[in-house]
Amino acid sequence: MSLSFQKYQGLGNDFLLIDNRHQEELLLTPEQAQFWCDRHFGVGADGVIFLLRGTGESDYRMRMYNADGSVAQMCGNGIRCLAKFIFALEGRSAGEIVRYRIDTLAGLIVPEVQADGQVTVDMGKPRLLAQQIPTTLAAADQKVVDVPLTVGDRQWLVTCVSMGNPHCVTFVEDVAALDLAVLGPQFEHHPAFPQRTNTEFVQVLGSDRLRMRVWERGAGMTLACGTGACATLVAAVLTGCLSPGGDQAQATVELPGGDLQIRWDLPSQHLYMTGPALAVFSGTLP
């Protein structure tokens, strides 16, 4: 039986989007998702995202496999792509502003398609306690801020944030000088992270600008990571690398695939991410 899909990308972070609303069982197995994400033998993508019918307070549900077939709790670039996928499925017109309540394995996430086609996402609150990441780098009820971690042949100062998925953020002088193909797997599989981790290597460019490279858990080196950009802004504030302006902290996060605008509303603790999501092509899996 053939299966239709749409390919979308958000800053080069690309996904296969599948309309799964007519049944509860996901239309691809983890092994099939891994095969179709392969850029040599399959279609090529950083993950597969399934759209399911909503339940309770949600309009829709999102479920996702990473490129290695593992389950992803959430994906910032992915949920922007999903919002544009829904926008098209509903037959919306360009210029409409539409908000969706989407149930994810990280909780309820609310993306809003803007009049200019960009998508702003209420990413919710960061989780900062070691047990919430999870990590063994601090006591369960303590934050992990500028904690030393030995990876490879050097010690790194890391700050850990969960955006529904685990992130390990480290600030460096020059992100371009790092060999992520070597460092990324060493961080991802470090025993301090029992569920593995995403890792962000960040260079501070100015009072409101950060440059970030990312190694994603289950996907490897990617061109962008929305939850990682959010975690990076939080880590920059917690470590004093950036100072909030009043009750807001915000920054442009430069990624290899382009820029994301990230804002942290300190009174509510909610993070907001704004960026593009574009359809690439449609196809059919045999």
Swiss-Prot record:
It holds the Pfam family DAP_epimerase. PROSITE patterns: DAP_EPIMERASE. Its EC number is 5.1.1.7. It is found in: Cytoplasm. Pathway: Amino-acid biosynthesis; L-lysine biosynthesis via DAP pathway; DL-2,6-diaminopimelate from LL-2,6-diaminopimelate: step 1/1. One of its GO terms (biological process) is lysine biosynthetic process via diaminopimelate. GO terms for cellular component: cytosol. Keywords: Amino-acid biosynthesis, Cytoplasm, Isomerase, Lysine biosynthesis. It comes from the Bacteria. One of its GO terms (molecular function) is diaminopimelate epimerase activity. Substrate binds at N13, N66, G76, N77, N165, N198, E216, R217, G226, T227. It catalyses: (2S,6S)-2,6-diaminopimelate = meso-2,6-diaminopimelate. The keyword S-adenosyl-L-methionine does not apply. The active site is at C75 (proton donor), C225 (proton acceptor). The record marks H167, E216 as: Could be important to modulate the pK values of the two catalytic cysteine residues. Belongs to the diaminopimelate epimerase family. HAMAP family: DAP_epimerase (MF_00197). Homodimer. Catalyzes the stereoinversion of LL-2,6-diaminopimelate (L,L-DAP) to meso-diaminopimelate (meso-DAP), a precursor of L-lysine and an essential component of the bacterial peptidoglycan. PANTHER family: DIAMINOPIMELATE EPIMERASE (PTHR31689:SF0), DIAMINOPIMELATE EPIMERASE, CHLOROPLASTIC (PTHR31689). This is Diaminopimelate epimerase. It comes from Thermosynechococcus vestitus (strain NIES-2133 / IAM M-273 / BP-1). The lineage of its organism: Bacteria, Bacillati, Cyanobacteriota, Cyanophyceae, Acaryochloridales. The gene is dapF.
